[in-house]
Amino acid sequence: GEQFIAAGRMDNLSSVHASLEAMKKAAEEYQGKDILVMMAFDHEEVGSSSRYGAGGPILADVLTRTARALGANEEERFQMFSRSSCASADAAHSVHPNYVGKHDPTHHPIIGKGPVTKINGNQRYASDATTVALWEAACEKAGVPVQRFVGNNDVPVSYTHLRAHETPE
């Protein structure tokens, strides 16, 4: 029969596990010269703005120092950042029958029907037109169905402020 697991931090732990498995597979198959990076951040539940949260400086610091250690000059570092992409993994909630109004009426994620792309009109997630297209193309290539979650704009959403796309100084 089907089983359910309930535990604290399950969304974060499952995202880290899935990311590590994907990174291992990508590293085995990757033929390019660029560096594959996977970061796991802390403090998502309190806004991600701590030193070790996604809104903090640690990712930009690590990438900048890595580029410098590999001999990249400033222009090469800027080029590295401009050809980079980023995915943010988190658990999505399916529609709760008692809180249907918290979801956009046309986007209801269903448990077990594939990963969910989270979209918010106020840019509260790492998704935009480019990242959604890249993600959905990768899922299609892998034969993985994709769902979309669009938050009801009248209901605030929790989010991870991810600074990874910002070029460090």
Language model regions located:
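Alpha-helical metal-binding/catalytic segments enriched in His/Glu/Asp
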Residues: 6-45
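Glycine- and acidic
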Residues: 1-8, 41-44, 115-121
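Metal-dependent peptidase/peptidase-like ectodomains
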Residues: 47-143
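Beta-strand segments within the central parallel beta-sheet cores of soluble alpha/beta enzyme folds
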Residues: 33-42, 78-81, 85-87, 149-151
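Single conserved hydrophobic/aromatic residue that forms the stacking wall/gate
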Residues: 161-164, 168-169
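Hydrophobic alpha-helix feature that most strongly marks membrane-spanning transmembrane helices
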Residues: 27, 140-147
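Small/polar glycine-rich anion-binding or flexible loop at a beta-alpha turn
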Residues: 150-162
